[in-house]
Each structure stands twice: as structure tokens, then as C-alpha cells.
């Protein structure tokens, strides 16, 4: 039984989140999704797991790219209900997906395994024990399986106090303030007036955790829209710092 409750299942929060995600000009649509898809291998006939799958948007894209079967896990019941509805609308996906109400921290309890690819978007900075999670992911992957994930960049997760931005007389962002970077651990935050916790790890810690869990890092990305000038006015803050860190790593056997 899962005793943990998702913030997305609280009154009105899911509706607010849905409105945010419906915006075609968002960090998810302009940065996260294109970068994640660019890191994927050929999915034809593959079995995938998406940790923290939300409403199943990535699962649908994986199926459209030829995945044989996709599994999604999430802590939020409302997210999974929406994912079920959206995936069922596409008749060709019938029998090719499964959804589990399961927090990422309890991945070991998932009855499925031998995944060719495991992905996760915007989720790992919520995990307290990252080494344990990586060990479980390693066990769930097939030989030479691939892990691809995005999380808030450590430059962002390190923040503890004060204003995040240095601004000029016109209130324009001119520099991002970096503080408490070396101080790893829990951060208390607030979004849509809902308190929640994230966990800060330095980039070095993330990389070393992956190496110690027997992963070979194949690619890292810190997208900042350098090649997409049409979005520079909408996302001016990206000229100062990358909001997300992406890592693609391959399972290495003992």
C-alpha cells in the first residue's frame, strides 16, 4: 500500500497543472520534450518504462515511435487516470501499455522488468536516495539497456534563500545567483502555493552516482535555446543558465 500522497492529487492543484501544461509555449514543450526525444535510441520493438509518467504524454510518443510495450508509473492517481483516458483514445495502443500507481522510490516493487529503455522527466530531483534508485534501475534494465532522464539543473536545485535573480533598474534579469551549491540535501519549496521538497546534488555527485551504479555515460545536454532564436524573447532567462540537465547512460554489466 502506498502511503505517500502526490501534491498533484490535492484540491485544484491538478487542474492548475493541466492549464499550465496546455500552454504550447512552455519549458516542457520547448525544452524538455524535444531534448528527451533527441536522446532516444531506435524504439522499434522495444520495451520501455517511464518513471513519473504523469498524464502519459511521453508514453504516447514512445508508442508512436514503434515501441512494442510501454509501462508508466506515477505517484498521482489523477495523473494516471488522465493517462489511461488519453492512451485509450488511441485504439492502436490497446494492449501495449500498462500503468502503475507507484512512487519512484518503490520501483523494486514493480512486477515488470527487462526494459530496453528507462526514462524519467522532471522527477529525479524529488528523490532523496539517488544511489539506491540507480541500483534498482540497473536491475530493471536488460543487458546494455539505456537510462535517459531529465531533472532540474543543480544550478537551480541548489538555491536556498533570497532572490534567484539579479535585476537591473528595469527589473530585467541580468544574472542568476548561485548559492549553497556545495550544500547538498533537502530544499523546501513552494509552487502554486503548495509546499514540497526537492533534493539538491552537485553535478559531480550525480555523475559519480551513475558511475558507481555501473552506468556508462553516453551523452549530457544542458539546453539553452542557442539554436532556437524564435524563443529567445519568451525565455530570456535561458541566456543566463540552463534550467535542466539531461543524461543518457548505458547499463554496464559487472
From Swiss-Prot:
Write down the Gene3D superfamilies for this protein, in alphabetical order.
Answer: Vaccinia Virus protein VP39
**What are the GO MF terms of this UniProt record?**
methyltransferase activity; S-adenosylmethionine-dependent methyltransferase activity
Q: Which residues cross the membrane?
A: none
Instruction: Give all cystine bridges in this chain.
Output: none
Q: Which domain of life does the protein's organism represent?
A: Bacteria
The name of this protein is Uncharacterized protein HI_0912
Q: What is the lineage of its organism?
A: Bacteria, Pseudomonadati, Pseudomonadota, Gammaproteobacteria, Pasteurellales
